[in-house]
Curated annotation (Swiss-Prot):
Keywords: Glycoprotein, Host-virus interaction, Inhibition of host NF-kappa-B by virus, Signal. Belongs to the asfivirus I226R family. Disulfide bonds: none annotated. The keyword Signal applies. Glycans are attached at N142, N164. This is Late protein I226R. Induction: Expressed in the intermediate phase of the viral replicative cycle (immediately after DNA replication). The keyword Nucleotidyltransferase does not apply.
Length: 226
């Protein structure tokens, strides 16, 4: 299952958003080829009409400057500016995955607004640091960081695959179901970059997991409890 399919599943008002999400993901796939400015302009054009998408996908790049976990990808992308921007997008996918199921509740929308205001005022701080200053969002502290690590690892794996894919998959599945799903969605989606070089076993494994992921997604009442 591709990531855009998962995002559409999480949107209760998903009509008309599918093409937008596909375009956004295309831009994300191209982040190693294009400039940060181009990406930002294109994303602004795509996302501006939808405030929810704007919040989760257009955080200031500077907020991630001090996030140590970004260094995990430094051996994949050489350009630091591009690296930070890609990590910024990945971070916001994580936020979307972990928070959207409660975004329709007024009290949570208020918390999101407050965090957004803090992000605009405290650009010298890391995004993670600002996020956990909100009492309402404290329950998501570990979830966001752990899922981000999984997401980053998955993208890193796409560019520099290792032979022990099955072992990694089994370990993720044993530890946390949502990590298992995310890893496979990212692998399936981003692997288009190196489609001709994809390992046969990797393709077969992803095909088998699609139905499993689809069934599990609709069982996730609250992502934080998975």
């Amino acid at each position: 299952m591709k990531m855009e399919t998962f995002l559409v599943c999480l949107f209760h008002n998903a009509d008309g958003l599918h093409q937008q999400i596909q375009e956004i993901l295309y831009l994300l796939r191209m982040h190693i080829y294009e400039t940060n400015l181009y990406l930002k302009q294109e994303l602004s054009r795509l996302i501006y009409p939808n405030r929810q998408l704007s919040f989760v996908l257009l955080m200031p790049l500077s907020l991630l400057r001090n996030w140590d976990d970004i260094e995990y990808l430094t051996d994949v992308v050489d350009d630091k500016q591009t690296l930070h921007y890609a990590a910024n997008l990945l971070t916001n996918y994580v936020l979307h995955l972990s928070m959207f199921q409660k975004l329709t509740k007024p009290y949570f929308l208020l918390a999101v607004k407050r965090v957004s205001e803090k992000l605009n005022k405290k650009q010298q701080h890391s995004f993670y640091e600002v996020l956990v200053t909100s009492e309402t969002l404290n329950n998501y502290e570990n979830l966001s960081k752990n899922i981000l690590n999984t997401l980053m690892f998955a993208v890193r794996y796409v560019f520099k695959p290792t032979p022990n894919y099955s072992e990694i998959l089994a370990e993720l599945e044993k530890k946390n179901k949502i990590h298992h799903i995310i890893f496979n969605m990212v692998i399936t989606d981003f692997a288009q970059i190196r489609e001709q070089q994809m390992d046969k076993h990797l393709c077969e494994t992803n095909n088998k997991l699609r139905q499993e992921c689809k069934e599990t997604i609709f069982d996730l009442k609250v992502v934080g409890n998975v």
